[in-house]
Amino acid sequence: MSDDRRRGDEDGGAGTGVITKTKPKTKKPSLYKVLLLNDDYTPMEFVVHVLERFFNKGRDEATVIMLHVHQHGVGICGLYTYEVAETKVTQVMDFAQQHQHPLQCTMERE
C-alpha cells in the first residue's frame, strides 16, 4: 500500500465527532372536565345512575355530585383526556336521550 492511503486511514475511516443523546420531551395531554348540567325534569335517581354507570362512582359519591349539580346548576363528573371525555359525553347524552330525559353533559378544558 502506498503511504498516502495509510495516512488517510489512521482513524480507521471513521471521522471524529460528538455523539449526543437527546431525550424526547413528552408533553402530558391536556385534561378535560366532564360536566353535568342541572335541569328541572331529569330525576335525581337517574343522574345518580349515570354517575355510577359511566363514571364508576360509588353510590355515596354519585349522590354528592348529583346534589351539587342540583344546587349549583353544574357539577364535575371527572377529568379525562380529550378522547375519553368526548366519549363519556356522547355516552351520557345518548343514554339520557334513550330514556327520554333532557340531561345535558358537556366538557371543557381544565
UniProtKB/Swiss-Prot annotation:
InterPro entries: ClpS, ClpS_core, Ribosomal_bL12_C/ClpS-like. Residues 1-10 have a biased composition (Basic and acidic residues). SUPFAM superfamilies: ClpS-like. Residues 1-27 are annotated as: Disordered. GO terms for biological process: protein catabolic process; proteolysis. Belongs to the ClpS family. Involved in the modulation of the specificity of the ClpAP-mediated ATP-dependent protein degradation. Binds to the N-terminal domain of the chaperone ClpA. This is ATP-dependent Clp protease adapter protein ClpS. It comes from Parvibaculum lavamentivorans (strain DS-1 / DSM 13023 / NCIMB 13966). The lineage of its organism: Bacteria, Pseudomonadati, Pseudomonadota, Alphaproteobacteria, Hyphomicrobiales.
